[in-house]
Swiss-Prot record:
Domain of life: Bacteria
Keyword line: Ribonucleoprotein, Ribosomal protein, RNA-binding, rRNA-binding
Keyword RNA-binding belongs to the record: yes
One Gene Ontology MF term: structural constituent of ribosome
UniProt xrefs under InterPro entries: Ribosomal_Su5_D2-typ_SF, Ribosomal_uS5, Ribosomal_uS5_bac-type, Ribosomal_uS5_C, Ribosomal_uS5_N, Ribosomal_uS5_N_CS, Ribsml_uS5_D2-typ_fold_subgr
Name the record gives this protein: Small ribosomal subunit protein uS5
Organism: Staphylococcus haemolyticus (strain JCSC1435)
Domain S5 DRBM stretches: 11-74
CC per GO annotation: small ribosomal subunit
Family classification: Belongs to the universal ribosomal protein uS5 family.
Domain notes: The N-terminal domain interacts with the head of the 30S subunit; the C-terminal domain interacts with the body and contacts protein S4. The interaction surface between S4 and S5 is involved in control of translational fidelity.
Length: 166
C-alpha cells in the first residue's frame, strides 16, 4: 500500500480527453469509455497512455498505468527547450519554439498538458494539421523526443561544448 501512495506522489496526471464509444450489437448499443491521460513529474519526464473500459474511472486508471510504462526524458534549458523543433504524427504537427523566462506556456489543450507536465515553463507552440487530441499528444511527444541538448550535439560531432559556440 505504501508503494502505491509513493508512486502517485511522484507523477502528476492530467486527463486530456474522455470519449464514449459504442459497439452496435443485435440488441442495441454497448457503450465503453476511452481515456487519454498524460503523466509527468514536472522535472523532465513525461508520458501518455490510453485506456478503455466499461466505466470512466477504470479507463482512466488503465490509461495512467499505460502512461507510466512509456515515459520520455525531455532535455530542458532554464525552463524551456534547447532549440526550435516540429513534432509530427500522422497529419498533425506541433511547432515548438523556446521562449524567454516569464513568457509562460503558450499552447492549446492537449499540447499544454504535455508541456506543463514535462516541466517546461516557457515555450511558444502552434498546432498544425490534425487537431485530434491523441495525434496532438503524439506529435508533441515526438518533438520532445527529438530535442538534443548541447552536450549531445557536441558528442555527435566529436567536439567539446565550447567548440560548438565558437
Amino acid at each position: 500500500m505504501a508503494r502505491r501512495e509513493e508512486e502517485t506522489k511522484e507523477f502528476e496526471e492530467r486527463v486530456v480527453t474522455i470519449n464514449r464509444v459504442a459497439k452496435v450489437v443485435k440488441g442495441g448499443r454497448r457503450f465503453r469509455f476511452t481515456a487519454l491521460v498524460v503523466v509527468g513529474d514536472k522535472n523532465g519526464r513525461v508520458g501518455f497512455g490510453t485506456g478503455k473500459a466499461q466505466e470512466v474511472p477504470e479507463a482512466i486508471k488503465k490509461a495512467v498505468e499505460a502512461a507510466k510504462k512509456d515515459l520520455v526524458v525531455v532535455p530542458r534549458v532554464e525552463g524551456t527547450t534547447p532549440h526550435t523543433i516540429t513534432g509530427r504524427y500522422g497529419s498533425g504537427s506541433v511547432f515548438m519554439k523556446p521562449a524567454a523566462p516569464g513568457t509562460g506556456v503558450i499552447a492549446g489543450g492537449p499540447v499544454r498538458a504535455v508541456l506543463e507536465l514535462a516541466g517546461i515553463t516557457d515555450i511558444l507552440s502552434k498546432s498544425l494539421g490534425s487537431n485530434t487530441p491523441i495525434n496532438m499528444v503524439r506529435a508533441t511527444i515526438n518533438g520532445l523526443q527529438n530535442l538534443k541538448n548541447a552536450e549531445d550535439v557536441a558528442k555527435l560531432r566529436g567536439k567539446s561544448v565550447e567548440e560548438l559556440y565558437n
